[in-house]
Amino acid sequence: GEQVLKGILVPHAGYVFSGSCAAWAYKLIAEAKFAKTYVILCVDHYKRCKGVSTVMDDFETVFGVAQVDKVMVQKLVDKGLVNVVDDVKEHSLEVQLPFLQHACMDNLQNLKILPLIVNDVSRIKDIAKEFGDDVCVIISSDLTHFGEDFNYVPFRYNIKKSVAEQDKNAMRFISDLDSDGFLCFVERGKITICGKKAIALGIEMFRVLDVVDVELLSYYTSSEVMHNDSNFVSYAALRFK
């Protein structure tokens, strides 16, 4: 039968940069068993939301309406675990929706999403416990942002190799489902992984979902697209089973 896919980690840059990386992961969503709810864990790039936030309003894209799982939202709100905001203008979420809808083309009418904008990690274990195994988790995060543009220049030599090595170490914590280790590693090195809090919540959800197998599907940097070696962002696609 169809494989159960517990989740993916995908980048959220413009499609021209990270689209081909994300496509590897969404291909697996298309092939896997259709989930009751797709939980999309996002970054709050504009620091507008406190704690962990979500919305009640459905989203509209070129493929039509993506319905928010309002029952699940209400459950999380009632338990004081998330708060509802009016409007999420957040590209780390918006970039994922057409990909997800396209992957679920046969089930568009039944597609339900639960976007969570993660700005705080104090209650991620409690939030994770609220989910059963009928969900698929989508973590929306790029990896290292390197260069003066990002105020992050820890390496002067062998830059690409050093960034790749560091990303590999970060991904090892993710694969080991060690959210504390991951956050400590990122904080200690002041590493510019924008979705670190979303990743930490994702890890806790994958622990609850009994993930046993994590695979790296794709990894590259924007410098391979733009040929700019002084400022670049690295992207990875991971799948969790």
Named regions from a protein language model:
Residues 1-204, 208, 222-226:
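Active-site histidine-anchored catalytic micro-motif
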Residues 111, 211-241:
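Long, Lys/Arg- and hydrophobic-enriched amphipathic alpha-helices
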